[in-house]
Amino acid sequence: ISINQDLKAITDMLLTEQIQARQRCLAALRQRLLDLDSDVSLFNGDLLPNGRCS
């Protein structure tokens, strides 16, 4: 029983970390969009290299 509880706690922790990482990524993307000088920058592919969050 204790092992199952430990596994559930670890899983919950990992899911929480994953959600927080995605939220940080989305916040960075939003900020990057706000910081763009013009729509032309978007079409030049200047948003993020490889379209990924670091």
Curated annotation (Swiss-Prot):
Keywords: Amidation, Disulfide bond, Hormone, Neuropeptide, Secreted. Injected in sexually mature animals califin B excites LB and LC cells of the abdominal ganglion and cause egg-laying. The keyword Heme does not apply. Belongs to the molluscan ELH family. Its main location: secreted. One of its GO terms (biological process) is neuropeptide signaling pathway. The modification Leucine amide is found at residue 36. Transmembrane segments: none annotated. This is Califin-B. Califin B probably derives from polyprotein B, which is also the precursor for peptide B. Disulfide bonds join 25-53. It comes from Aplysia californica. One of its GO terms (molecular function) is hormone activity. It comes from the Eukaryota. InterPro entries: ELH.
